Design a protein with these regions (language model features):
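The feature captures the conserved acid-bearing segment of alpha/beta-hydrolase catalytic domains
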Residues: 1-77
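C-terminal catalytic histidine-bearing segment of alpha/beta-hydrolase fold enzymes
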Residues: 49-52, 69-115
């Protein structure tokens, strides 16, 4: 679970893409590539020592779970506004906090499905 995201919004990097020369074609490519946001449903500790908690990160949500949901939902809205398919998945891993071992077990089928 990422601690914060670079949103496709007009806010400064690293939390947004303000003043970056991103064409509509490049944006469509980014949103059409197969991808996944995988979140542990228990990754909700706002005081986790490895969680970024500056103003920009906190504006995305109080914890990794909230931030991931908001990032995914925002990208769905952008794809809809561009009238294009969105190929990302949102997968919530039950009973997982910020734990690599539980996340990789859930990620393996997605990562290997095209082999």
């Amino acid at each position: 679970n990422a601690g914060w995201y670079t949103f496709l919004k007009d806010i400064n990097y690293p939390y947004g893409v303000k003043d970056m020369p991103i064409s509509e074609d490049r944006l469509k490519w980014f949103l059409s590539v197969k991808g996944a946001i995988m979140l542990g449903d228990e990754d909700t500790d706002p005081n986790d020592g490895s969680l970024r908690n500056d103003k920009g990160a906190k504006e995305q949500g109080n914890n990794r779970f909230q931030r991931g949901i908001r990032y995914f939902e925002r990208n769905v809205l952008i794809a809809d506004s561009l009238d294009m398919p969105f190929r990302w998945r949102l997968q919530v891993v039950k009973k997982a906090a910020h734990e690599n071992s539980k996340m990789i077990q859930a990620a393996a089928p997605f990562l290997l499905e095209d082999l």
